[in-house]
UniProtKB/Swiss-Prot annotation:
Gene3D superfamilies: 1.10.1420.10, DNA repair protein MutS, domain I, MutS, connector domain, P-loop containing nucleotide triphosphate hydrolases. SUPFAM superfamilies: DNA repair protein MutS, domain I (SSF55271), DNA repair protein MutS, domain II (SSF53150), DNA repair protein MutS, domain III (SSF48334), P-loop containing nucleoside triphosphate hydrolases (SSF52540). This is DNA mismatch repair protein MutS. HAMAP family: MutS. Transmembrane segments: none annotated. CDD domains: ABC_MutS1. One of its GO terms (cellular component) is cytosol. One of its GO terms (molecular function) is ATP-dependent DNA damage sensor activity. The gene is mutS. The lineage of its organism: Bacteria, Pseudomonadati, Chlorobiota, Chlorobiia, Chlorobiales. Keywords: ATP-binding, DNA damage, DNA repair, DNA-binding, Nucleotide-binding. GO terms for biological process: mismatch repair. Pfam families: MutS_I, MutS_II, MutS_III, MutS_IV, MutS_V.
Length: 872
């Protein structure tokens, strides 16, 4: 921080002492009715908020930069700073300046960071706001990564154990607002930081916070236990360290009211399907690739939730499909009952819509950030639980019955809030009046004193009017001068001598008298005591609610799940989805399948064309050829989304669906340059393809679109062919392989389980009509020129392209008078006899030991050898 070298003023010394303890935070320093920032902080705040940068006198030293804003508008300004990635420390005056002996005492009263905020101006109620920590531990010769994450506004707290190479994808999947790492691990994480979400703030912490013993002690203290076995996290050392780091960071940032965080769990890969970044992006599960918003995503179609808790959970469900058949069946049965009995579903939906965000309101109550109106709504929401419970206990399916039984009625708490908080309570606590009459005897007495005294003031007003003959005389009040008698200047000659002047105005003067002073003291004293007492009573009520946090959180979790199941059912009924049969076999049958998002975008004049899909022992790898724009990519995405929905527990857009359980969905669809990190389209494509080949199993679903198009025709086709063989021979995964390399159709005759399909078209004399129907057999034409025409390419370009194509089909073409070899002669022939050196090299390959990467390297060597033999 830049600061003048000479003597600072007492207040500035106080500021610098606090700033020294919080160097990484923008320090908001309360001065009167403003929060001020100084020095470099002021420059940052001025720039970030577009407010005036001014200067303040600093004792005998020169003036210092200063920028600030009114304290009553601080929440909005702080929200803007945090959204820009800043961390903010709030330093308040903690004593009355009029009673201060010397400099006013100030303390840090709040710290707000991207990962630690309770403000509605920052949070989206349909999104979680995660704070995540990463820890690395050595276990023998290997390094294990542990992750933990928490949403302080909902008390969701989880840990996970990862391989180091899984860290980047985990962080991108979670997309936390803030990530905590050890300073010593900064360099280790540097290579993958470019893969982290760009809007995520990375906070480096002292290394000592990442000790195992330290973490265990912090966790035991938080959960008031000697062992963490009951939470199922006992053996996850790295994850426990990360969780301990989060709790220490919360304590360090003065989040010392954490008793509402009552549980911690672990993410188990055995229970949930892992979806990597490419799959989430390519399937457009949460956001569309077009603009990154929810518009055009699966979530937009599926989310019919009635409250924020359900909205947050349905996001997690879609991003973490289930892998346990029993869990999937329980959800599907519950959805079926909700779908078949729509009156029940509508009744439940009505109750859900009247329940506010219990999780986030609870966190604000427990941290004393709530307002009276919100607490009243909290009590009203809890009062709906008996009605919801009664409705669910009328159901017949196991899961809905269990959810109904899990709901905990809280009549005592509801009655307490009803008795304590006034129905007309607003957002402000400054002037009191939000604690209900009859709740507390002392408060009622103080209010009676104030009210009686105010009645006496009216009597004084009438008496003084009669005594002075001034009919316009008024007894009034303001916060600066208290109670006073106001008399217009035209009546000043009638003012008695015992009137004591308090203030002179342009058209009037204000006075007081002994009787007015007496009752003013009674009123102000009673009102001041009332406000203090109301604040204490509201604080005590908040503590009582926080003590029942575990029960409230149980109810919140149940309500969120009910909301998601009802949402699935509403969508299934409206859009004609069917109940999928999910089993442990490898068969995958979809009859009349539809893309859930695209079908909603189609007009009634151009309805979505449904397609069938079959994987069984005879069909494991489907090669799909056909023209661009004919629906190949949509067909691939449709298959992935149907499987994802089925294993999330939703009905699916099809006439019939049998889903053999899938452990992971992999996609390689489309391509985009990652130029910021120096990666080309083809390198990105190969990285993604390599990840698929190294991680897929026979239980996986592979959706591959146009593999190899980022390089030359010969290289691309060689890679596509080789990958197909490797998937067939070594993995055995159910695979949809869309390609423009029509030569791959040859694989059907060579490999058992490889079957050709194509996207059909109708050719007329004038144009080509894309039917978007996937049928058996290979295609022999890509119709690229027709696609170019539809895109609006100039007519002369289209005509010339047809001439060139005709020449190619005759095996030679004349371009500017130069004879060109046929297209076949420019592509590598996989069946042509090579010279002796090429033959020898091929014969010496040990195919049983080749990895996918080795195969690509050897292919490159063979290509170089072949080109050298051709004199090129």
């Amino acid at each position: 921080m830049s600061s003048p070298p000479r003597e600072h003023s007492p207040m500035m010394r106080q500021y610098l002492d606090v700033k020294e303890r919080y160097p990484d935070y923008l320090l908001l320093f309360r001065v009167g009715d403003f929060y001020e920032t100084f020095f470099d902080d002021a420059k940052e705040v001025s720039s970030a908020l577009n407010i005036v940068l001014t200067r303040r006198s600093n004792g005998s030293s020169s003036e210092v930069p200063m920028a600030g804003f009114p304290h009553h508008a601080s929440e909005g300004y702080i929200a803007r700073l945090v959204k820009k990635g800043y961390k903010v420390a709030v330093c308040d005056q903690v004593e009355d300046p009029s009673e201060a002996k010397g400099i006013v005492r100030r303390e840090i009263t709040d710290i707000v960071t991207p990962g630690i905020t309770y403000s509605d101006k920052i949070l989206d109620d349909r999104h979680n706001n995660y704070l995540c920590a990463l820890a690395l531990l050595k276990e023998g010769r290997r390094v294990v990564a542990g992750a933990a994450f928490i949403d302080v506004t909902t008390a969701e707290f989880k840990i996970a154990e990862l391989l180091p190479e899984e860290v980047a994808d985990f962080v991108r999947s979670l997309h936390p607002a803030e990530l905590l790492i050890a300073r010593k691990e900064k360099e280790r994480f540097e290579p993958v930081r470019k893969e982290f979400p760009p809007d995520m703030v990375v906070t480096e912490l002292d290394d000592w916070m990442f000790g195992e013993d330290q973490a265990s002690a912090v966790l035991a203290r938080q959960f008031k236990t000697h062992s963490l076995k009951g939470f199922g996290i006992h053996g996850n050392s790295a994850g426990k360290v990360a969780a301990g780091v989060i709790l220490q960071y919360l304590e360090e940032t003065r989040q010392n009211r954490l008793h509402y965080i009552t549980r911690i769990g672990t993410l188990q890969n055995t229970d949930y399907m892992t979806l990597d970044l490419q799959t989430r992006r390519n399937l457009e599960i949460i956001s569309s690739m077009q603009d990154g918003t929810i518009n055009g995503s699966l979530l937009q179609v599926i989310d019919r939730t009635a409250n924020p808790m359900g909205a947050r959970l349905i996001r997690r469900w879609l991003q973490s499909p289930l892998k346990r058949l029993e869990d999937i069946a329980l959800r599907l049965d519950a959805v079926e009952e909700f779908k078949d009995f729509s009156p029940l579903r509508r009744e439940v939906h009505g109750h859900l819509s009247e329940i506010n965000d219990l999780e986030r309101v609870l966190s604000r109550i427990a941290t004393f950030r709530s307002i009276p109106r919100e607490m009243r709504q909290f009590g009203s929401a809890l009062s709906k639980i008996p009605l919801l419970k009664e409705a669910l206990l009328q159901t017949t399916t196991a899961r809905l019955q269990a959810l109904g039984r899990s709901l905990v009625e809280m009549p005592e708490l509801v009655a307490l809030i009803e008795k304590a908080v006034d129905p007309e309570a607003g957002a402000s606590m400054r002037d009191g009046g939000y604690i209900r009459a009859g709740y507390h005897q002392e408060l009622d007495e103080l209010r009676t004193i104030a009210s009686t005294a105010k009645d006496r003031l009216l009597e004084i007003q009438q008496e003084e009017r009669a005594r002075t003959s001034i009919s316009s005389l008024k007894v009034q009040f303001n916060k600066v001068f208290g109670y006073y008698i106001e008399i217009s200047k035209s009546n000043l000659d009638k003012v008695p001598d015992y009137y004591e002047k308090k203030q002179t105005l342009v058209n009037a003067e204000r006075f007081t008298i002994p009787a007015l002073k007496e009752y003013e003291a009674k009123i102000l004293n009673a009102e001041e005591k009332s406000i203090v007492l109301e604040q204490r009573l509201f604080h005590d009520l908040s503590l009582l609610i926080a003590e029942q946090a575990a029960l409230v959180q149980t109810n919140a979790a149940v309500i969120a799940e009910i909301d998601c199941l009802a949402s699935f059912a509403a969508v299934a009924e409206e859009y004609g989805y069917c109940k999928p049969e999910v089993a442990g076999h490898d068969r995958l049958l979809v009859t009349g399948g539809r893309h859930p998002v695209l079908e909603r975008m189609m007009s009634t004049d151009d309805p979505y064309v449904s397609n069938d899909l079959l994987f069984d022992r005879k069909q494991r790898l489907l090669i799909i050829t056909g023209p661009n724009m004919a629906g190949k990519s949509s067909y691939l995405r449709q298959a992935g989304l149907i499987v994802l929905l089925a294993q999330a527990g939703s009905f699916v857009p099809a006439q019939k669906a049998e889903i053999g359980l899938v452990d992971r969905i992999f996609t390689r669809v489309g391509a985009s340059d990652n130029l910021a990190s120096g990666e080309s389209t083809f390198l990105v494509e190969m990285n993604e393809a390599a990840s698929i080949l190294n991680n897929a199993t026979s239980k996986s679903l592979l959706l591959l679109d146009e593999i190899g198009r980022g390089t030359s025709t010969s290289d691309g086709m060689s890679i596509a062919w080789s990958m197909s063989e490797f998937i067939h021979d070594s993995i055995g995964a159910r695979t949809l392989f869309a390609t423009h390399y029509h030569e791959l159709a040859e694989l059907e005759t060579r490999l058992q389980g490889v079957v050709n399909y194509n996207a059909t078209v109708i050719e007329t004399a004038e144009k080509v009509i894309f039917l978007r129907k996937i049928v058996r057999g290979a295609s022999d034409n890509s119709y690229g020129i027709e696609v170019a025409r539809m895109a609006g390419m100039p007519q002369e370009v289209i005509v010339r392209a047809k001439e060139i194509l005709a020449g190619m089909e005759k095996r030679e073409i004349d371009v500017s008078g130069i004879k060109q070899p046929s297209i076949e002669s420019m592509q590598i022939s996989l069946f042509e006899e090579a010279d002796s050196r090429l033959r020898t090299a091929i014969e010496n390959l040990d195919l049983d030991r080749l990895t996918p990467l080795d195969a690509l390297i050897e292919l490159k060597k063979l290509q170089d050898l072949a080109l050298k033999g051709c004199g090129r």
